[in-house]
């Protein structure tokens, strides 16, 4: 599992883009037990969790809004490819 680092400032929006173009099955936080932010399904429905302010989500991107130091976390995306799951992580730092 790869990990990338993203930096942002308080009050800013942050766009995380999964550029590997695989079918994403969900976006999660990976700190404190890994809560689901958005569950992306093939019919386009999403499930919102209040852990972070999410303004939009798709199979390839997640936009977090109004970042604070409380949203400084590990964020991840899960992929499904030929019935196997994989993923990527982003360490988000808010200053």
Curated annotation (Swiss-Prot):
Protein name from the UniProt record: Protein RL5A
Gene coding for it: RL5A
Pfam families, A to Z: RL11D
